[in-house]
């Protein structure tokens, strides 16, 4: 079983704010392209911190159950052209498969992620947190807080 790295809402917001600060000045951006689905929350945080209201989505999907799959663009950010002046935001770059497809679609965009693993790191222009390749990231939107029974209840 791979190692796990748990991300809280507080940590995600803090890391997003640090990453956003490096994207100034805002005047260089026409808008944000949020990579669905993992990049939707980080893109919302970036849009808020940078005061950007023009947010497009890029929806990339894959098929074939749980196996490594071919990428299919379900919806492109059509107003972004070749990406010049656009900030592409995703939560994570892992092996680089999705990142390569994004680079092909928007070669002139600046591509940023909150988290980066070594195999994907060369494909992004900026990221905030380096994560080992063999580590699974548990994002806050994939987790739920639950009641923890007191230890004395185990007796």
From Swiss-Prot:
SUPFAM superfamilies: PRTase-like. GO terms for molecular function: guanine phosphoribosyltransferase activity; hypoxanthine phosphoribosyltransferase activity; magnesium ion binding; xanthine phosphoribosyltransferase activity. Its EC number is 2.4.2.-, 2.4.2.22. Purine salvage pathway enzyme that catalyzes the transfer of the ribosyl-5-phosphate group from 5-phospho-alpha-D-ribose 1-diphosphate (PRPP) to the N9 position of the 6-oxopurines guanine and xanthine to form the corresponding ribonucleotides GMP (guanosine 5'-monophosphate) and XMP (xanthosine 5'-monophosphate), with the release of PPi. To a lesser extent, also acts on hypoxanthine. Its main location: membrane. InterPro entries: PRibTrfase_dom, PRTase-like, Xanthine_Guanine_PRibTrfase. GO terms for biological process: GMP salvage; IMP salvage; purine ribonucleoside salvage; XMP salvage. One of its GO terms (cellular component) is plasma membrane. Guanine binds at residues 94, 137. This is Xanthine-guanine phosphoribosyltransferase. The keyword Transferase applies. 5-phospho-alpha-D-ribose 1-diphosphate binds at residues 37-38, 69, 90-98. It comes from Aeromonas salmonicida (strain A449). Its cofactor is Mg(2+).
